[in-house]
């Protein structure tokens, strides 16, 4: 059914199905100046998280893209554009991992900038 709509579906190892969508590298933050104004005014801003819909510019209009926001790259871009001293990523998982939900998933106990 989803394939007939132009969507891609894959079967996971546990037998369930998942719709596959693109997660393109973010190019820019659309509301950057609004966010900058709030930060400069001393407000706590929560932005660039999951659940948002990426958009594409078409002329002077913005149109939703059939994709997901790659939130780690997006918040990194936002921090860079704001010249942030600190980037704090909050998550509900016990540990960050590589290869999430795959047989070779590896949990990271700690990471450094080196």
What are the functions of these language-model segments?
Residues 1-8, 12-44, 48-114:
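Active-site phosphate/oxyanion-binding loops
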């Amino acid at each position: 059914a989803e394939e007939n709509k132009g969507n891609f579906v894959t079967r996971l190892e546990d037998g369930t199905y998942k719709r596959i969508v693109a997660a393109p590298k973010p190019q820019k933050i659309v509301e950057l100046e609004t966010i900058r104004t709030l930060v400069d005014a001393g407000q706590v801003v929560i932005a660039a998280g999951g659940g948002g819909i990426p958009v594409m510019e078409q002329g002077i209009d913005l149109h939703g893209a059939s994709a997901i926001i790659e939130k780690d790259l997006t918040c990194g871009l936002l921090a860079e554009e704001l010249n942030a001293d600190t980037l704090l990523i909050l998550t509900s998982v016990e540990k960050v991992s590589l290869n999430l939900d795959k047989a070779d998933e590896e949990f990271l106990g700690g990471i450094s900038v080196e």
